[in-house]
Amino acid sequence: MSTNQYDVLVLGAGASGLMTAYMAAQRGRKVVVVEKANKVGKKILMSGGGKCNFTNLYVEPSNFISHNPHFVISALTRYTNWDFIGMVCEYGIEYEERKHGQLFTLKGAKEILAMLLSECEKTGLVDIKTNCEVKAITALDEQGFQIATTLGYFEAESVVIASGGLSIPTLGGSGIGYEIAKQFGHHVYPTRAGLVPFTFSDSFKEVTTRLSGNAVDATLSNDLNSFTEALLFTHRGLSGPSSLQLSNYWDVGQSFKIDFLPTVDLHDYLKAKKHSQPKALLRTLLGEHFPKSVVVE
Protein backbone atom coordinates (compact mmCIF):
# COMPACT_ATOMS: atom_id res chain seq x y z
CA MET A 1 0.00 0.00 0.00
CA SER A 2 1.40 3.40 -1.00
CA THR A 3 2.18 6.06 1.59
CA ASN A 4 1.11 9.68 1.22
CA GLN A 5 3.82 12.17 2.23
CA TYR A 6 3.05 15.43 4.04
CA ASP A 7 4.81 17.93 6.28
CA VAL A 8 1.91 18.12 8.74
CA LEU A 9 -1.00 15.81 9.50
CA VAL A 10 -3.88 17.38 11.45
CA LEU A 11 -6.21 15.00 13.23
CA GLY A 12 -9.69 16.53 13.14
CA ALA A 13 -11.44 18.95 10.77
CA GLY A 14 -13.19 21.14 13.30
CA ALA A 15 -12.51 24.80 14.00
CA SER A 16 -9.08 24.26 15.56
CA GLY A 17 -8.05 21.68 12.96
CA LEU A 18 -8.94 23.88 10.00
CA MET A 19 -7.27 26.93 11.55
CA THR A 20 -4.14 24.86 12.23
CA ALA A 21 -4.07 23.61 8.65
CA TYR A 22 -4.46 27.12 7.26
CA MET A 23 -1.75 28.56 9.51
CA ALA A 24 0.70 25.74 8.73
CA ALA A 25 0.09 26.08 5.00
CA GLN A 26 0.74 29.82 5.22
CA ARG A 27 4.23 28.86 6.33
CA GLY A 28 4.73 26.73 3.25
CA ARG A 29 3.93 23.41 4.88
CA LYS A 30 2.10 20.72 2.93
CA VAL A 31 -0.83 19.67 5.13
CA VAL A 32 -3.39 16.89 5.26
CA VAL A 33 -6.41 17.08 7.55
CA VAL A 34 -8.02 13.73 8.38
CA GLU A 35 -11.61 13.62 9.63
CA LYS A 36 -13.45 10.43 10.52
CA ALA A 37 -16.90 11.98 9.95
CA ASN A 38 -18.44 12.28 6.50
CA LYS A 39 -18.39 16.09 6.66
CA VAL A 40 -16.07 18.70 8.13
CA GLY A 41 -16.96 21.30 10.75
CA LYS A 42 -20.08 19.66 12.16
CA LYS A 43 -19.63 21.30 15.57
CA ILE A 44 -19.08 24.68 13.92
CA LEU A 45 -22.44 24.35 12.16
CA MET A 46 -24.32 23.61 15.38
CA SER A 47 -22.54 26.15 17.59
CA GLY A 48 -24.46 29.15 18.83
CA GLY A 49 -27.76 27.63 17.83
CA GLY A 50 -26.58 27.49 14.23
CA LYS A 51 -25.34 31.10 14.27
CA CYS A 52 -21.80 30.29 15.51
CA ASN A 53 -20.59 32.35 18.47
CA PHE A 54 -17.25 32.70 16.75
CA THR A 55 -15.43 34.95 19.26
CA ASN A 56 -15.84 37.56 21.98
CA LEU A 57 -14.93 41.23 22.20
CA TYR A 58 -13.45 40.76 25.67
CA VAL A 59 -10.88 37.99 25.46
CA GLU A 60 -8.48 37.77 28.38
CA PRO A 61 -6.26 34.90 29.58
CA SER A 62 -8.27 34.82 32.82
CA ASN A 63 -11.33 33.76 30.78
CA PHE A 64 -9.72 30.44 29.95
CA ILE A 65 -9.51 27.34 32.12
CA SER A 66 -6.09 25.78 31.65
CA HIS A 67 -3.44 23.86 33.56
CA ASN A 68 -0.88 25.88 31.57
CA PRO A 69 -1.81 29.58 31.85
CA HIS A 70 1.49 30.64 30.24
CA PHE A 71 0.47 28.87 27.04
CA VAL A 72 -2.86 30.70 27.05
CA ILE A 73 -1.09 34.05 27.32
CA SER A 74 1.30 33.14 24.50
CA ALA A 75 -1.47 31.86 22.22
CA LEU A 76 -3.70 34.90 22.72
CA THR A 77 -0.77 37.24 22.12
CA ARG A 78 0.27 35.62 18.85
CA TYR A 79 -3.26 35.41 17.42
CA THR A 80 -5.93 37.65 18.92
CA ASN A 81 -9.70 37.80 18.68
CA TRP A 82 -9.26 40.93 16.58
CA ASP A 83 -7.20 38.98 14.05
CA PHE A 84 -10.10 36.60 13.57
CA ILE A 85 -12.67 39.41 13.49
CA GLY A 86 -10.56 41.01 10.78
CA MET A 87 -10.76 37.84 8.70
CA VAL A 88 -14.53 37.69 9.19
CA CYS A 89 -14.82 41.29 7.98
CA GLU A 90 -12.65 40.58 4.92
CA TYR A 91 -15.18 37.94 3.89
CA GLY A 92 -18.07 40.34 4.38
CA ILE A 93 -19.69 38.14 7.01
CA GLU A 94 -22.28 40.10 8.94
CA TYR A 95 -22.41 39.61 12.68
CA GLU A 96 -23.97 41.01 15.82
CA GLU A 97 -22.87 41.53 19.41
CA ARG A 98 -24.98 39.91 22.10
CA LYS A 99 -24.58 39.81 25.86
CA HIS A 100 -21.10 40.00 27.38
CA GLY A 101 -19.42 40.78 24.07
CA GLN A 102 -20.41 37.54 22.33
CA LEU A 103 -20.28 37.76 18.53
CA PHE A 104 -22.67 35.72 16.36
CA THR A 105 -23.12 35.59 12.60
CA LEU A 106 -26.39 36.96 11.24
CA LYS A 107 -26.81 34.47 8.40
CA GLY A 108 -25.51 31.28 9.96
CA ALA A 109 -22.48 29.26 10.98
CA LYS A 110 -22.06 27.93 7.44
CA GLU A 111 -20.38 31.24 6.56
CA ILE A 112 -17.62 30.70 9.12
CA LEU A 113 -17.04 27.14 7.92
CA ALA A 114 -16.93 28.30 4.30
CA MET A 115 -14.41 31.00 5.26
CA LEU A 116 -12.07 28.50 6.93
CA LEU A 117 -12.30 26.09 4.01
CA SER A 118 -11.64 28.93 1.57
CA GLU A 119 -8.54 30.03 3.49
CA CYS A 120 -7.23 26.46 3.37
CA GLU A 121 -7.99 26.13 -0.34
CA LYS A 122 -6.30 29.42 -1.26
CA THR A 123 -2.96 28.17 0.04
CA GLY A 124 -2.98 25.27 -2.41
CA LEU A 125 -1.22 23.19 0.23
CA VAL A 126 -4.09 21.67 2.25
CA ASP A 127 -5.75 18.34 1.51
CA ILE A 128 -8.83 17.33 3.52
CA LYS A 129 -9.82 13.68 3.86
CA THR A 130 -13.27 12.80 5.25
CA ASN A 131 -14.42 9.31 6.27
CA CYS A 132 -10.80 8.86 7.29
CA GLU A 133 -10.37 7.33 10.74
CA VAL A 134 -6.94 7.07 12.36
CA LYS A 135 -6.15 3.55 13.51
CA ALA A 136 -2.55 3.86 14.69
CA ILE A 137 0.37 6.28 14.77
CA THR A 138 3.99 5.13 14.83
CA ALA A 139 7.10 7.23 15.31
CA LEU A 140 9.61 6.67 12.51
CA ASP A 141 13.24 5.90 13.29
CA GLU A 142 14.65 8.86 11.38
CA GLN A 143 12.06 11.61 11.73
CA GLY A 144 8.32 12.06 11.71
CA PHE A 145 5.40 9.68 12.00
CA GLN A 146 3.52 7.05 10.06
CA ILE A 147 -0.25 7.23 10.41
CA ALA A 148 -2.44 4.24 9.56
CA THR A 149 -5.99 5.21 8.57
CA THR A 150 -9.04 3.68 6.94
CA LEU A 151 -7.94 5.41 3.72
CA GLY A 152 -4.39 4.12 3.80
CA TYR A 153 -1.05 5.23 5.22
CA PHE A 154 0.28 8.74 5.63
CA GLU A 155 3.69 10.01 6.69
CA ALA A 156 4.22 13.43 8.21
CA GLU A 157 7.02 15.29 9.94
CA SER A 158 4.53 16.66 12.48
CA VAL A 159 1.18 15.47 13.84
CA VAL A 160 -1.31 17.88 15.41
CA ILE A 161 -4.09 16.52 17.61
CA ALA A 162 -7.19 18.64 17.01
CA SER A 163 -9.77 15.91 17.51
CA GLY A 164 -11.70 17.69 20.24
CA GLY A 165 -13.01 16.28 23.49
CA LEU A 166 -15.34 13.47 24.45
CA SER A 167 -18.59 15.43 24.09
CA ILE A 168 -21.22 14.70 21.45
CA PRO A 169 -19.98 11.38 19.99
CA THR A 170 -22.56 11.67 17.20
CA LEU A 171 -20.57 14.64 15.87
CA GLY A 172 -17.27 12.80 16.01
CA GLY A 173 -16.17 13.29 19.62
CA SER A 174 -13.95 10.44 20.81
CA GLY A 175 -10.98 9.67 23.03
CA ILE A 176 -8.48 9.08 20.22
CA GLY A 177 -6.65 12.33 20.88
CA TYR A 178 -6.08 11.46 24.53
CA GLU A 179 -4.80 8.01 23.60
CA ILE A 180 -2.31 9.38 21.09
CA ALA A 181 -1.08 12.02 23.53
CA LYS A 182 -0.47 9.36 26.19
CA GLN A 183 1.25 7.12 23.65
CA PHE A 184 3.90 9.75 23.01
CA GLY A 185 4.52 10.63 26.63
CA HIS A 186 2.28 13.64 27.16
CA HIS A 187 0.59 14.06 30.52
CA VAL A 188 -3.20 13.94 30.20
CA TYR A 189 -5.27 15.39 33.01
CA PRO A 190 -8.41 13.51 34.09
CA THR A 191 -11.44 14.58 32.09
CA ARG A 192 -14.74 15.77 33.50
CA ALA A 193 -17.87 17.39 32.18
CA GLY A 194 -17.88 21.13 31.57
CA LEU A 195 -20.46 23.62 30.33
CA VAL A 196 -23.21 21.25 31.44
CA PRO A 197 -26.52 21.70 33.30
CA PHE A 198 -26.91 20.84 36.97
CA THR A 199 -29.15 17.81 37.51
CA PHE A 200 -30.82 16.81 40.76
CA SER A 201 -32.29 13.62 42.18
CA ASP A 202 -33.72 14.96 45.46
CA SER A 203 -36.79 17.03 46.29
CA PHE A 204 -35.32 20.07 44.52
CA LYS A 205 -35.80 18.24 41.22
CA GLU A 206 -39.55 18.23 41.89
CA VAL A 207 -39.41 22.02 42.18
CA THR A 208 -37.40 22.52 38.98
CA THR A 209 -39.70 20.13 37.13
CA ARG A 210 -42.75 22.16 38.08
CA LEU A 211 -40.95 25.35 37.01
CA SER A 212 -39.56 23.83 33.81
CA GLY A 213 -39.36 26.40 31.02
CA ASN A 214 -39.13 29.44 33.28
CA ALA A 215 -36.00 31.60 33.12
CA VAL A 216 -34.80 34.29 35.52
CA ASP A 217 -31.64 36.35 35.88
CA ALA A 218 -29.59 35.08 38.81
CA THR A 219 -26.08 34.84 40.21
CA LEU A 220 -24.67 31.36 40.72
CA SER A 221 -21.51 31.23 42.80
CA ASN A 222 -19.13 29.01 44.73
CA ASP A 223 -15.72 29.53 46.31
CA LEU A 224 -14.02 29.71 42.90
CA ASN A 225 -16.22 31.91 40.73
CA SER A 226 -19.61 33.50 40.16
CA PHE A 227 -21.72 34.23 37.08
CA THR A 228 -24.71 36.52 36.67
CA GLU A 229 -26.75 35.50 33.65
CA ALA A 230 -30.00 33.75 32.79
CA LEU A 231 -30.93 30.70 34.87
CA LEU A 232 -33.30 28.20 33.26
CA PHE A 233 -35.41 25.69 35.18
CA THR A 234 -35.67 22.29 33.48
CA HIS A 235 -37.36 18.97 34.17
CA ARG A 236 -34.00 17.63 35.39
CA GLY A 237 -32.55 20.64 37.22
CA LEU A 238 -30.93 23.94 36.27
CA SER A 239 -29.54 25.11 32.95
CA GLY A 240 -28.96 28.40 31.16
CA PRO A 241 -25.73 30.43 30.80
CA SER A 242 -25.11 30.95 34.54
CA SER A 243 -25.39 27.22 35.29
CA LEU A 244 -23.31 26.16 32.31
CA GLN A 245 -20.52 28.60 33.19
CA LEU A 246 -20.36 27.66 36.87
CA SER A 247 -20.26 23.95 36.03
CA ASN A 248 -16.67 24.50 34.84
CA TYR A 249 -15.69 25.39 38.42
CA TRP A 250 -17.79 22.80 40.24
CA ASP A 251 -17.35 19.12 41.05
CA VAL A 252 -19.64 16.39 42.32
CA GLY A 253 -20.51 16.80 45.99
CA GLN A 254 -19.72 20.50 46.13
CA SER A 255 -22.31 23.14 46.94
CA PHE A 256 -23.10 26.45 45.27
CA LYS A 257 -25.29 29.44 46.00
CA ILE A 258 -28.06 31.08 43.98
CA ASP A 259 -28.93 34.77 44.33
CA PHE A 260 -32.23 35.32 42.56
CA LEU A 261 -32.06 39.11 42.99
CA PRO A 262 -28.40 39.90 42.26
CA THR A 263 -29.02 43.57 41.48
CA VAL A 264 -31.29 44.23 44.45
CA ASP A 265 -30.37 44.91 48.08
CA LEU A 266 -33.25 42.95 49.57
CA HIS A 267 -33.17 44.71 52.94
CA ASP A 268 -33.31 48.19 51.38
CA TYR A 269 -35.90 47.07 48.83
CA LEU A 270 -38.31 45.67 51.41
CA LYS A 271 -37.78 48.66 53.68
CA ALA A 272 -38.65 51.05 50.84
CA LYS A 273 -41.70 49.01 49.86
CA LYS A 274 -42.91 49.00 53.45
CA HIS A 275 -43.23 52.77 53.20
CA SER A 276 -44.48 53.05 49.62
CA GLN A 277 -46.78 50.00 49.62
CA PRO A 278 -47.46 49.13 53.28
CA LYS A 279 -50.33 46.76 52.43
CA ALA A 280 -48.63 44.93 49.59
CA LEU A 281 -48.25 41.16 49.92
CA LEU A 282 -44.83 39.58 49.51
CA ARG A 283 -45.97 37.64 46.45
CA THR A 284 -47.07 40.91 44.86
CA LEU A 285 -43.63 42.44 45.38
CA LEU A 286 -41.88 39.32 44.11
CA GLY A 287 -44.12 39.43 41.06
CA GLU A 288 -42.30 42.58 40.02
CA HIS A 289 -39.17 40.48 39.48
CA PHE A 290 -40.26 36.92 38.70
CA PRO A 291 -42.81 35.07 36.56
CA LYS A 292 -46.03 34.25 38.40
CA SER A 293 -45.33 30.51 38.44
CA VAL A 294 -41.98 31.09 40.15
CA VAL A 295 -43.56 33.35 42.78
CA VAL A 296 -46.27 30.79 43.56
CA GLU A 297 -43.69 28.05 43.94
Regions found by a protein language model. Name each.
Residues 25-49:
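Glycine-rich FAD pyrophosphate-binding loop
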Residues 72-80, 99-118, 129, 168-172, ...:
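Short beta-strand to alpha-helix junction loop
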Residues 38-40, 45-46, 55-61, 187-190, ...:
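An anion/pyrophosphate-binding glycine-rich loop and adjacent beta-alpha core
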Residues 49-99:
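Glycine-rich active-site loop/strand segments that organize a redox cofactor
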Residues 9-11, 34, 134, 153-170, ...:
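Short hydrophobic core segments
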Residues 6-33:
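N-terminal Rossmann-like FAD-binding beta1-loop-alpha1 element of flavoenzymes
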Residues 158-201:
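Glycine-rich loop(s) and the adjacent beta-strand/alpha-helix scaffold that form part
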Residues 130-143:
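A conserved short coil-to-beta-strand element within the FAD-binding core of flavoproteins
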